[in-house]
Amino acid sequence: MRQHNLRILFFLLVLWGVAVACSRREARFRIGVSQCSEDEWRRQMNSEILREAHFYEDVEVDIRTAVDDNDRQAKDIRELIAEGVDLLIVAPNEATPITPVVEEAYNRGIPVIVVDRKILSDKYTAYVGADNYEIGKAVGEYVANVLHGQGDVVEISGLVGSTPAVDRHQGFVKAISAYPGIRLLAVEDGAWLQLKAGEKMDTLLSRFPHIDLVYAQNDRMAAGAYAAAAREGREKDMRFIGIDALSGKDYGVEKVLAGELDATFIYPTGGDRVMQIAMDILNKRDFPRETILGTSVVDRDNALIMKMQTAHIGTLDGKIETLNGKINQYLASYATQQVVLYGSLSALLLLVGLLVAVYLSLRAKNRLNRELSMQKKKLEEQKTQLIQQKELLE
């Protein structure tokens, strides 16, 4: 019975050791990220979120992408809610269809950070993004400057219904309205996509024999518009301006250096700032409800510097990823060593328990043997006395 109890104790100790070792690796917070689309700008933001997460302990980040599908994004958000995330980061595809599901999460007590695009409600915990209206105004002022207040302009907007598309257009129109010599000939919906923007540009080229400047609301659409104009041999007749200013092959900064774009405006991704605010919320620290990220123009004067700085940052990011990978390996090795250590301690405790049990058993056996010997001796003495009495009687 005593050995049976010791076996139970041993298994309980082993389970305790494993539980302690594993519990130190479990995430304390789980953050769900719902991205509306998957492009270079979104990938950059995701990379920044994940990189910043390395600097916090016990955080797990689950990123899902809706690929420009409102229904899919609503489904993604509801799945994250059902899985019990502690905080949601949402970049809405379109404001109207996504607002209800964001409100649903907020009403259930889940903190929600809305990024990049806004919703049609104030039921969110924090917002992080650029001021798209101000970016549109900055583009308008730049256009007025390079055209010297005179010229014919076409605009290729982002997805109709998305707040950045609306705000960038309104800001642009506000700026150029101060210059009567600038005419906005037409606005076409490029849906943020390069191929669709190219198709819309084909239409614009057929409609308007003279265009001085093409304003595309992101660099991918600007590249699509440039390619369409190049097919018609008209790319030298007009200027092209985009928004995003990402570095890398075929991105905005490279397009400026190649002479395809005259300029691109920085649209900061801000993934690191989003993650910092998320951790402030989860740890009950003060945080700003509205964080507006700044912008600036990238043209031929500063594009090379921008490219070099981004390349240097990319190198540092790679080193951080390598270091984080090694840290994870060390932590995994440490956790394994913990399990082995706790298992060894449990085995040692069992061994000590068994030794104690053996010792106590031997003591009990020796005591029993002594008692039996004494009883045997008494019986022998009684037997001898009986024999002697019998002999006397005879």
What is the meaning of each model-derived region?
Residues 87-106, 172, 186, 190-250, ...:
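Hydrophobic alpha-helical
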Residues 160, 164, 176, 271-346:
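Hinge/cleft segment of the Venus flytrap/periplasmic-binding protein
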Residues 41-55, 59, 135-139, 163-182, ...:
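Short, solvent-exposed amphipathic alpha-helices that sit
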Residues 31, 35, 49, 138-180, ...:
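An alpha-beta-alpha
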Residues 327-386:
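Alpha-helical transmembrane signal-anchor helices
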Residues 73, 128-153, 196-198, 247-252, ...:
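Hydrophobic alpha-helical segments within soluble ligand-binding/sensing domains
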Residues 32-48, 52, 56, 62-72, ...:
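Extracytoplasmic "Venus flytrap"
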Residues 95-134, 145, 152, 158, ...:
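Flexible loop/hinge segments that line or gate small-molecule binding clefts
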